Amino acid sequence: MFGTAHKISTSTIWLAVLVSAVGLGWPERHQPVLYADDGDWDSRHIAPFVTTPDEVVTRMLELAEIEKGDVLYDLGSGDGRIVVAAAKRYGIKAVGFEIDPVLVKDSREIVKQAGLERLVEIREQDIRTVYFSPATVVTMYLYPGANLRLRPVLMRDLKPGSRVISHDFGMGSWKPDRVARFKDSADLSRTIYRWRIAEPPRR
C-alpha cells in the first residue's frame, strides 16, 4: 500500500503503477485513487493502492532478517503479496491489514489458492486501529506523514528487537539502523529502511 499524507503528482502515481505491476497472477484492475486527506489523520482513507514490485518485496523481507517464530504485520496489504511471500518463503505467520473490501476479498482468495490459510490472515481493518504488540516485523509502503503518525504507536506497542520496514519513506528523526538502496529491473531507484525497536533504558 502506498499512503499519502502529502501531495504527489498524478503523473508520478501513474508511473509508479505502470512500472510496479509486475507480479504475475495478482489482480491489477484496481486503479490508484488519491484521497484528499491533506494530512488529516482522521480521514477514513489514507492511501491509494499501488503494488509493491515482487523484487522489492524480496528485498524488504531480506532486510527484516526474518527468523522462525516471527509474526509479520503488513499495513495496507493491498493484494497480499507481502504476507503471502513471507509465509511462503519463511513459514511464518503473516497478517495483512487492508481497508478496501475489494482488495480484502481478492487477497483472501489468493491466500486460499496458495494454500496458506493456516499462516496468512487478511483483516479488513483501518491501520489506525491496529494493536501491534503481537508483531515482531511490521512492513509498510506509506507516505512520511502516515509513517510519522504511526511511529509513536509502533515504539509503544512493539517488543524490543522487533523490526519495522518501510519502502521509500523514512520516519523523520527516528534514524534507521539499516538502509538498502538499489535500482530495480525498471531502472528505478528504490530505498528500503529498517528500524529495530531498542531495549528500554535502564533506570
Regions found by a protein language model. Name each.
Residues 2-16:
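Bacterial N-terminal signal peptides that target proteins for export
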Residues 100-134:
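S-adenosyl-L-methionine
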Residues 133-149:
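A short SAM/SAH-binding and catalytic strip from SAM-dependent methyltransferases
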Residues 69-78:
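Conserved class I S-adenosyl-L-methionine
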Residues 26-67:
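Class I SAM-dependent transferase core
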Residues 80-84:
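Glycine-rich SAM-binding Motif I of class I
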Residues 93-98:
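Conserved SAM-binding motif I beta-strand of class I
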Residues 145-203:
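C-terminal substrate-binding/active-site "lid" region of AdoMet-derived donor-dependent transferases
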